[in-house]
Amino acid sequence: MIFVDRTDEMARFRAALTQEKPSLVALYGRRRLGKSTLIKKVLSEQDVYFLADRSEAQHQRILLAKVLGQQFPDFDKVEYPDWEAIFRAVNYRTEKRFTLCLDEFPYLVEQSPELPSVLQKLVDERLLKYNLILCGSSQNMMYGLFLDSTAPLYGRTDELMRLAPLRLPYMQEALGLDDAGTIEEYAVWGGVPRYWELREHRASFEEAIWHNVFSVNGALYEEPVKLFRDDVKDIVKISTIMSYIGAGANRISEIAARCNEPTTNLSRPLKKLIDLGFLERDILFGVDEKNAKKSLYKIADPFMAFYYQFVVPNLSFIELGRRLPIEQALKAHFQEYVSMQWEKLCREACTGNVINGILYGKAGRWWGTLVGEDKKLEQAEFDVVAESFDKKYLLVGECKWTNKENAYRLIAELERKASLLPFAEKHTIVPILFLKNAPTEDCKQAMLPKDVIALLK
């Protein structure tokens, strides 16, 4: 698969590694995002890349010495009793500055808790003659090592980067998909390059899902558990919470009831999942997040959302190789699932972008009770709501992932409901339809997948 995006990260790497003094760079993020691939794109032939494992410290030093032996002849002929000894030995042998990358750095720290203090000493004394890249998939450990104010390496990095999933347009570029196909496939694979690579190896979207996800031998069959192992101690509880949310329990009271626990017991695991990027809080548009009492918990990662909606309920069928029940579940609910991901993408597309000459702020959802002119109450939901930066306009959007929509009817109903919103006063309402296909009528207020993809670039 072609290497796409990451231009900002590569530029930051190169700037740090070529500055006058040796640099310390840290890179972290969940697995499968391409951290190692990115680093290898930056490293040159004279640089040294070392991938740590979970073996004992002395064995790790032996392995590192062997790798360094390719750069410095006979470097591995010596036994190094501790980490300071090996780093100082590299210093002694360094004549021309190069870069040493320690990938999965948290594995080294697990076996040698003193390692961050050793590196702090070398950095503070300005003894290093070479650049150091420290990379890790354990977001908790990397955060604790570099962002905790009490940690030895806090404030010592020249660059500290958290790698995020790639944006949707880059998947279209990497896999050569049409616009609607890009939306549907992103709803499953999300912005994770490794998943795109697995998809590319199969002839079709359907084949890729069955081969990698709905198979006991599939590369992604146990993916969530593998991801949780890096950062979560109680995997059973975390996976249970994700399962309930994936099944539609979105309020904390609903999740607590299914877990048979008080809501107070869920605050920490829910926050943990949000910090790791697996969950998000859906808050009413216009409400400050800190003061929000009315919120919904949703699975943030598309693949995780797909997994907990379609894989977890069908694990028994997958284990038995029963394909038909899974096919029926996909036929009945997959398009509805895509429509939920489509809504989220439409909100992202509107946030901070110019649409029809108007710049909008952060887009969100709104749901609740509207009061009509006749004082009649009605329940309503708006998929997309965004206020313009000048406070003059209010974009309200309806998202549909179905065919042959009556655009005029939808626009009229959208305008009617929007006029009843409690915060609509003194705003010009801008109704927008986000549709899978072009409407049967000529409608200038419709945005299609190609328009949304363009805004997400």
What are these regions (language model features)?
Residues 1-324, 328:
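Phosphate-binding site recognition
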Residues 295-457:
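A cross-kingdom feature that marks ATP-driven nucleic-acid transaction machinery
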